[in-house]
Regions:
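Conserved helicase ATPase core of P-loop NTP-dependent helicases/translocases
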Residues: 262-291
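Interdomain hinge/linker at the junction between the two RecA-like core domains of SF2 helicases
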Residues: 158-230
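Conserved Walker A/P-loop ATP-binding site and its immediately adjacent core
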Residues: 36, 41-43, 47-77, 160, ...
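Conserved strand-helix element at the start of the C-terminal RecA-like helicase core
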Residues: 54-65, 99, 220, 227-257
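A short beta-strand element within the Helicase C-terminal
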Residues: 289, 298-312, 336
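Inter-Walker segment of RecA-like/P-loop motor cores
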Residues: 72-109, 273-279
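Conserved SF2 helicase motif VI
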Residues: 311-335
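SF2 helicase catalytic motif II
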Residues: 110-144, 150
Length: 337
């Protein structure tokens, strides 16, 4: 049974409803499902301070990893570390921060060892399973080591992650749990779906979403000039834009039309630039064209970033990209998507 669940309002931050001492016991898990910008990382950093267990923090992108390291060092040591030094500074004796891919390659190091495992952006275990084997390796590792690991799952898109959680956490009735599971704002459907089955998920924290600050528009993907002209007009008014594309070739076409535009297509070829964006929490040009490398994890605190272009039919990707532009949850500025 799920022990309990709490739901916060769209104007609250997750740290206002979560107890930093409420850390899962070994063999148990917790789900924090709240929108981007609601303070999941800050809440987790506070929880890390309250545990004596070794901690492994895992996320799916280098950009998100830089952001976590920056936030953790600032919270624990009070330091604003230059981007180029992030990799050289230790997070602490008992804290490791790695990507899911790195964990998949090194699970043998942690087999049978007791620790707190924080799985950020955990929906990626489903999203990336179509083109990478790391997700399957990690799920196998989690199921084989449930007794010696305390688990905290973090996601802004819970509807995309419940099947993974059911597979890992349900010890009986998994097929029925997967069939019955659905997600709503109040978490009641998840609660009832698990209620008949033995599960190790003991706590769910959820936050309501607010999309009222978003002004949605549609464009024709093949008409690059029309889109570029719109972006240029917005730039002339002082607006910066984040442009998410599915393939690099489309990004290069937009680069040519928009001019010498800042772009990041891989987290390997522009590590210094990625670290700089994470450090400054904004990009330097009027426009940034990117792919999945900046889909999640990075926080852009820039009041000039008021236009987001997303080339996708996937609502999960849409939510993740919108969430890169951080707004004040109590009084958000208007953003065109």
């Amino acid at each position: 049974l799920i022990g309990d669940y709490k739901v916060g309002t769209s104007k609250q931050y997750i740290s206002q409803i979560i107890d930093s001492n409420d850390i899962p016991n070994l063999g148990e898990s917790m789900l924090i499902a709240s929108p981007t910008g609601s303070g999941k990382t800050s809440a987790v950093i506070k929880m890390i301070k309250h545990t004596s267990m070794p901690v492994i923090y895992v996320t799916n992108r280098k950009m998100a990893l830089c952001q976590f390291k920056k936030d953790d060092i600032k919270a624990s040591k009070g330091l604003d570390v230059p981007a180029e030094l992030l990799d050289s500074i230790s997070l602490g004796e008992n804290i490791i921060a790695i990507t899911y891919q790195e964990l998949a390659e090194t699970t043998y190091k942690y087999k049978g060892k007791k620790h707190l495992l924080i799985l950020d952006e955990v929906h990626c275990l489903l999203e990336d399973a179509n083109f990478s084997v790391y997700a399957e390796k990690i799920i196998r590792y989690l199921k084989a080591n449930r007794d010696n690991i305390a688990r905290i799952y973090l996601t802004a898109t819970p509807d995309a992650v419940t099947p993974v959680i059911a597979e890992i956490e349900c010890e009986s009735g998994q097929e029925q749990a997967l069939f019955a599971m659905d997600w709503d704002t109040n978490v009641k459907s998840v609660f009832h779906a698990y209620a008949s089955y033995k599960t190790r998920l003991k706590m769910v924290y959820s936050m309501e979403s607010n999309w009222n600050y978003i002004n949605f528009k549609l464009y024709t993907p093949d008409d690059t000039k029309e889109l570029a002209d719109y972006i240029k007009r917005e730039n002339e008014q002082g607006t910066k834009s984040l442009i998410y594309v599915n393939d690099i070739s489309k990004g290069k076409v937009l680069q040519e039309v928009l001019g010498n535009t800042q772009h990041i297509y891989s987290d390997e070829d522009k590590r210094a630039e990625i670290a700089e964006i994470a450090q400054n929490e904004k990009f330097s040009d009027r426009n940034l064209i990117t792919t999945k490398v900046a889909e999640n994890g990075v926080s852009l605190h820039d009041d000039e970033l008021n236009l987001i272009v997303v080339e996708t039919l996937d609502p999960i990707t849409l939510k993740q990209v919108i969430g890169r532009a951080r707004v004040n949850r109590k009084n958000p500025r208007e953003i065109t998507v």
